[in-house]
């Protein structure tokens, strides 16, 4: 086996992106022979300081060159003769100049009078020519501004690696008619829950037409829900979870559309109601009305996930309370010992507005106190309990057309004595809170475990 001795000579390699048909022109694109020699010598001593630029238009002074990147190599340089395939002059390649950066945007100055004038005067370094150089200050339109290009247009030197790939969750399926279509194979199952509002004439009586047959697991949850809806036709999701086996938690939202519909407005908002049952036509449904509260809690508030309100303990995950689930000794009697309406109201349901808003103000006062880690103020509670129950027409006519200044004056009028500033402040806060409208879209984090009640 023949062996060759590697020479002690070391070389630098330049990977030029063009064809070297003309040797002189080839060297000019790299700045000339002297620039090449200087860059190669510097690469062996200090590679970071080696500068070699590629200029595809050497005669254009405004061309933006591409700088080479120097990399250390341990390659071999050989000379091969085609006649006899012999190998000679084996040497080492220690440094390589690579032009891998993207070329900058180029701007041609060939038709620029200002650049031509600049080159013929300042660049020749002639005193008389420089002395004659002047800039025309005549105003021109912006689109006709003639000026030299900037030294750099783009600061992006390397191309972006986008890695464009087809969505792995999307696939092509064949339809019954023979055509093909692209579908999301791993998409979230849609929950075909029927929703309704207080403006409809009749409530839904059966499930959605697009709802298919339930799976075995979903059917088990349905069978567990049937006796609950027979006993009580209107439920919140949290109340149902507390009456079901914990293993059914994930499947509840898929089982509810088979038995119930969802209210999106009115006094039964965000409650699931048994198909065919209309709480607007049954005064006994007053016990199933729901009260909503916007509570902004921090991470320190933790509690049992219950649907019952006792007025003493804060349960952060529950923001919706049904009347039948309120056991607070102060509030519960107000809901039981009251005269109901003859017809269901779109906002306050079967309760008269005066009693309804009094209960809501009491619950809000207690909830805000519990958030602060305190017990509700007896002064505030008694003030609400002793306040006159104003019907809705009188309640809003006094305040809707008044600003904050008029509100303060009204509070002072209600408290004729005006001797206790603390009581006045409490009344102002209570009235402001009572006038806050709690929209369905404003409820924040009604339930952390079940944000998507409708599905995608």
UniProtKB/Swiss-Prot annotation:
GO BP annotations, alphabetical order: transcription initiation at RNA polymerase III promoter
InterPro entries found in the cross-reference section: TF_IIIC_su-5_HTH, TF_IIIC_Tfc1/Sfc1, Tfc1/Sfc1_N, TFIIIC_tauA_Sfc1
Biased composition (Polar residues): 407-416
Location (main, coarse): nucleus
Ranges of Acidic residues composition bias in the record: 441-456
Classification via Pfam families: Tau95, Tau95_N
Renumbered residue ranges of the record's region Disordered: 394-416, 437-456
Post-translational modification summary for this protein: Phosphorylated.
Superkingdom in the source lineage: Eukaryota
GO molecular function, one term: RNA polymerase III cis-regulatory region sequence-specific DNA binding
GO CC aspect terms: cytoplasm; cytosol; nucleus; transcription factor TFIIIC complex
Entry keywords, A to Z: DNA-binding, Nucleus, Phosphoprotein, Transcription, Transcription regulation
Location in or out of the cell: Nucleus
PANTHER family named among the record's database cross-references: GENERAL TRANSCRIPTION FACTOR 3C POLYPEPTIDE 5, GENERAL TRANSCRIPTION FACTOR IIIC, POLYPEPTIDE 5
Subunit structure: Component of the TFIIIC complex including sfc1, sfc3, sfc4, sfc6 and sfc7. The subunits are organized in two globular domains, tauA and tauB, connected by a proteolysis-sensitive and flexible linker. Interacts with sfc3, sfc4 and sfc6.
Function, in words: TFIIIC mediates tRNA and 5S RNA gene activation by binding to intragenic promoter elements. Upstream of the transcription start site, TFIIIC assembles the initiation complex TFIIIB-TFIIIC-tDNA, which is sufficient for RNA polymerase III recruitment and function. Part of the tauA domain of TFIIIC that binds boxA DNA promoter sites of tRNA and similar genes. Participates in the interconnection of tauA with tauB via its contacts with sfc3 and sfc6. Serves as a scaffold critical for tauA-DNA spatial configuration and tauB-DNA stability.
Name the record gives this protein: Transcription factor tau subunit sfc1
Organism this protein belongs to: Schizosaccharomyces pombe (strain 972 / ATCC 24843)
